[in-house]
Amino acid sequence: MRITKFFKEFFSNSQSSGVLLVLCVTISLMIANSSAATGFQAILDKMIGPYSVSMWINDGLMAVFFLLVGLEIKRELLKGELSNFKNASLPIFAAIGGMIVPAIIFTIFNHGTEYSNGWAISMATDIAFSLAIVAMLGKSVPSAIKVFLAALAIVDDLGAIIVIAIFYTDEIHWNYLAFSGLVIVLLAALNYFKVKKHIFYLIPGVFLWYFMHHSGIHATIAGVILAFTIPANSENESEPSPLEKLEHFLHIPVSFAIMPIFALANTNITFKAGMVDGLFSSFGYGIVFGLILGKLIGINLFSFIAIKLKISSLPDRSRWIHMAGAGLLAGIGFTMSIFIALLSYKDSQELQDSAKFAILTASILAGSLGYLLLKNAAKNDNSI
């Protein structure tokens, strides 16, 4: 009985998922730098059908994660923190600043060098890890800041996907993109005609994922698109809507299975000689300062301008110290930054390894600083 109660409390506690994710990162790094590294990598490279285990995790399972985040954002846009224009516009301005300033900082350090192609590395935010840190803080962070960071990260990821498609993708398969468009039209029609059954959305959603993946565009975007077509109204107001039902159903598997698996598979970075030296070079400075200072300055500067121009407003019950904390957490680049680094330096394993270490270092620093800042803000709020 006590064990059942423990698991019930564990899975209902938002902080538990963040702690579990950090634990998985630690385990993954330990495995990557032990004798088990080769065997672990072999598991990730193992083919299941046409794709590797790693691909199924990064493009398949993470599409489900993006589906959940998309559902949460849609709910907030319709009924919650983002339901008015001033609140909804702020994450967009913040994300734009959070992409432009880091890219400028990296370019300042690396313009005209062999590293210059990696200008987009510092633009990315790893939404899974940034939201996990927020989850660890529990109720000490205003709910509006959590929603702001989630929306910002979604816009940031959309921006990164567009950048990858334009600057880093060798070829876009327009026929598959056209098929994706047809599926989106079908999903929109289902919503328009008030079809409520989840199955009628989920089956086309699988096809949307398949077509997106084969088009050359990152398939996780299919999860967000699908989420925005799920009906948010129920036939009976006393019952939860299809959106709310699906969101509730996905919460535990995403938080306690998909995200930990993602962490295990994507932070297995092997430390090599010379990696630390790479931090103290224009290349390392561009990545580290881009992710930490670039995100912090860009997000808060563009937010400040939008608020001063009365286009946007600060999230409910939040202060600029909360915005600074969110800006730092957005500097957790991790997997998205590593993905862009791999595309930027396809022909240089040495540069890929140096980029991975710089991204890992910057992400740990940004996450730690953001956590401490938001934790301190909560203490100050409680003392008032």
Walk through the language-model features, giving the residues of each:
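Predominantly late transmembrane helices and immediately cytosolic-facing juxtamembrane segments
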Residues: 2-13, 193, 197-207, 211, ...
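Alpha-helical transmembrane segments of multi-pass membrane proteins
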Residues: 25-39, 266
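Structural signature of hydrophobic alpha-helical transmembrane segments
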Residues: 55-66, 113-128, 169-185, 218-225, ...
